[in-house]
Amino acid sequence: MIGQIKVLGKSKEEAEAEALKQLEAVGLADRADFKPGALSGGQQQRVAIARAVAMHPNVLLFDEPTSALDPELVRGVLDVMRDLAKNSGMTMIVVTHEMGFAKDVADRVVFMEGGVVVEQGTPDVIFNNPQNPRTAEFIGAIA
């Protein structure tokens, strides 16, 4: 809430209401009073997303948001991100190895290797008709 108060100039009451609204959106309103250590990794990630969204950014960056999670927790985080992509109108830049998620949610996919862009295009092109042999090799390996 401090970011909303200090940066956005909201009152404590407005910040609390926005925080609760965003926790509700990620399915964690019932955990509003919990300390981070009392939350699972997936819940912590969803709280982090709620905190970021509460600041009403135009662009939200995600760097491997599911990489440190147990497999059973990944879906909850991806569901929150999928909902944001569909309903927020916010630009999201996501670094991920979750190819199914990228294929379903992205407007544009950039395939990189060694910090270099290998190929970029629509999900249809990248996943179904890659133009670069390295992209094709990667897609073939995960199919």
Segments predicted by a language model, with ranges:
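Conserved catalytic motifs of ABC-family nucleotide-binding domains
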Residues: 56
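Catalytic Walker B motif of ABC-type/P-loop ATPase nucleotide-binding domains
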Residues: 60-63
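Helical segment within the ABC ATPase nucleotide-binding domain
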Residues: 75-87
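Conserved ABC ATPase signature
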Residues: 35-39, 43
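H-loop/switch region of ABC-family ATPase nucleotide-binding domains
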Residues: 96-97
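ABC ATPase "signature
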Residues: 120-121
